């Protein structure tokens, strides 16, 4: 396919970042400018020669700007096939438009405002913009469509290399971006309006109707491929990593990789688990994860202390694990890790220059800097099933001291309460059935993923015993209620002093009585944290 010279461009943008400089570059290269409304006014204010679309078409903007570019002289100039439609274009006075520069009304920003009304949303549905974008993308053989201001400099550079022309490869790539842009835009609109109707399949359920505003009738998702991978969870599976560009919260998706090999599928999944867990803590914390489960979590006076205590829980499982911190990774901690263990990934809000130098001794270790976080943003979680998608709120629920209900005769001490809340936060990130033993803000044993809650407790005890850690005097957290007293009896045998769990079983009183028989503290949270 041939290069196409850019002689005339139509510019109509809502986000005007960089548009003046780009227009100046086009004019410098001999390109004639057409424009509309606010964009035309801005270009004229910067002494750029610009023709208003209404002057070109002979038809004024009308209906408060709702109709500006919906005209045959505009779309004929964009859609006209060079070499095929030249005669009809000349007959009707239609000039070829070789480049269209458009970004759309800020619908997402508008509906995100707390005071946004339906009328506000409707007025921010762009009509002319997407129409021009689709027209130009369809005719990419002859026309360049630009929807992202990050492409401005590269386009001008290519024009310089190709006598003010753009290659077919570039035009095709720009067309793909354009279709992605309009697809995402329409998806946002569909999702917004879909939240305003009652779900037609479950109209008889009043409670579901009350909550329907959270989940649109049709769910449209837009993710951008960030990374192609050698393979997926297993070597026979192909894989790629897609990200939501609207998410700004510190995460594995937004993190900056400072060194190391490319992240694998499992690296990303495990790093996400580690980072989301360490975000739960305010004091200096370290979380070590293996196969998406915490194998060691601790708080400390600093992150070196926290790391040493987290590692102590299960050094065997920590080998080849993922380490997450909620403070800057410093030189001392980096050196301790390098000297002590093999690690796949380290992630922290920030990494000091000295720590980076230390980590260069292990150049294959993936070192990530994710930035600071101040709060957890509300979001949806997804689980794919064959033929469907389960959607729910992300589990951001946590409890504080004031939310706890002490149901045992013995009351917890201040330190026991701290340990119970620490233990509860960890249990939230352990696969169900989850049992966590902890003491002095350090995990002592973790039992994960067992079909029987009692066996998860046994595994937690075995883990502690294998590492020479004392279970006696520990607190225990369970992600869900105890259906029978056997779990409490087993905990008492190994010296557990306090138990925290949601409660809600038909046999709660039987379980509470068991705690009292063993002079244990029992605290209910009223909140379950299943994790499958």
Swiss-Prot record:
Pfam families: AICARFT_IMPCHas, MGS. Residues 1-147 form the MGS-like domain. GO terms for cellular component: cytosol. It catalyses: (6R)-10-formyltetrahydrofolate + 5-amino-1-(5-phospho-beta-D-ribosyl)imidazole-4-carboxamide = 5-formamido-1-(5-phospho-D-ribosyl)imidazole-4-carboxamide + (6S)-5,6,7,8-tetrahydrofolate; IMP + H2O = 5-formamido-1-(5-phospho-D-ribosyl)imidazole-4-carboxamide. Its EC number is 2.1.2.3, 3.5.4.10. Pathway: Purine metabolism; IMP biosynthesis via de novo pathway; 5-formamido-1-(5-phospho-D-ribosyl)imidazole-4-carboxamide from 5-amino-1-(5-phospho-D-ribosyl)imidazole-4-carboxamide (10-formyl THF route): step 1/1; Purine metabolism; IMP biosynthesis via de novo pathway; IMP from 5-formamido-1-(5-phospho-D-ribosyl)imidazole-4-carboxamide: step 1/1. Keywords: Hydrolase, Multifunctional enzyme, Purine biosynthesis, Transferase. One of its GO terms (biological process) is 'de novo' IMP biosynthetic process. GO terms for molecular function: IMP cyclohydrolase activity; phosphoribosylaminoimidazolecarboxamide formyltransferase activity. SMART domains: AICARFT_IMPCHas, MGS. The IMP cyclohydrolase activity resides in the N-terminal region. This is Bifunctional purine biosynthesis protein PurH.
């Amino acid at each position: 396919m041939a290069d196409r010279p850019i002689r005339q461009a139509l510019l109509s943008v809502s986000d005007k970042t960089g548009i003046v400089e780009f227009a100046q570059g086009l004019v410098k290269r001999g390109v004639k400018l057409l424009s509309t409304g606010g964009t035309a006014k801005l270009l004229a204010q910067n002494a750029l020669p610009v023709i208003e679309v209404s002057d070109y078409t002979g038809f004024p903007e009308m209906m408060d700007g709702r109709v500006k570019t919906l005209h045959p002289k505009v779309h004929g100039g964009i859609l006209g096939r060079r070499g095929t439609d030249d005669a009809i274009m000349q007959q009707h006075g239609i000039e070829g438009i070789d480049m269209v520069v458009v970004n759309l009304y800020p619908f997402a920003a508008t509906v995100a405002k707390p005071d946004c009304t339906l009328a506000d949303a409707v007025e921010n549905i762009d009509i002319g913009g997407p129409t021009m974008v689709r027209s130009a993308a369809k005719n990419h053989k002859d026309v360049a469509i630009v929807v992202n201001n990050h492409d401005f400099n590269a386009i001008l550079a290519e024009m310089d290399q190709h006598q003010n022309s753009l290659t077919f490869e570039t035009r095709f790539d720009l067309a793909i971006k354009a279709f992605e842009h309009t697809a995402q835009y329409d998806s946002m609109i569909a999702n917004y309006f879909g939240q305003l109707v009652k779900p037609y399949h479950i109209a008889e359920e009043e409670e579901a109707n009350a909550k329907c505003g959270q989940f649109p009738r049709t769910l449209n998702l837009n993710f951008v491929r960030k990374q192609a991978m050698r393979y997926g969870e297993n070597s026979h599976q192909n894989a790629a990593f897609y990200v939501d560009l609207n998410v700004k919260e510190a995460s594995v998706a937004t993190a900056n990789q400072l060194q190391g090999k490319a992240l694998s599928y499992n690296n990303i999944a495990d790093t996400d688990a580690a980072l989301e867990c360490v975000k739960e803590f305010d004091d200096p914390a370290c979380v070590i994860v293996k196969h998406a489960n915490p194998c060691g979590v601790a708080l400390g006076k600093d992150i070196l202390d926290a790391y040493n205590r987290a590692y102590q829980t299960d050094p065997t499982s920590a080998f080849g694990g993922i380490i997450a911190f909620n403070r800057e990774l410093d030189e001392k901690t980096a050196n301790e890790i390098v000297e002590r263990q093999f690690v796949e990934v380290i992630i922290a809000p920030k990494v000091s220059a000295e720590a980076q130098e230390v980590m260069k001794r292990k150049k294959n270790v993936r070192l990530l800097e994710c930035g600071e976080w101040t709060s957890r943003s509300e979001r949806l979680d997804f689980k794919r099933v064959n033929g469907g998608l389960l959607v729910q709120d992300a589990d951001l629920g946590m409890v504080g001291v004031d939310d706890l209900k002490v149901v045992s005769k013995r009351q917890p001490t201040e330190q026991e309460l701290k340990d119970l809340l620490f233990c509860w936060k960890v249990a939230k990130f352990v696969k169900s059935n989850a049992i966590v033993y902890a003491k002095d803000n350090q995990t002592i044993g973790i039992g994960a993923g067992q079909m029987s809650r009692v066996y998860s407790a046994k595994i937690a005890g075995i883990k502690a015993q294998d590492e020479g850690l004392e279970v006696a005097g520990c607190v225990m957290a369970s992600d869900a209620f105890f259906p029978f007293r056997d779990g409490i009896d087993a905990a008492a045998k190994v010296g557990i002093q306090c138990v925290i769990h949601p409660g809600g079983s038909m046999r709660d009183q039987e379980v509470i009585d068991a705690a009292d028989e063993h002079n244990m503290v029992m605290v209910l949270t009223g909140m379950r944290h299943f994790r499958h």
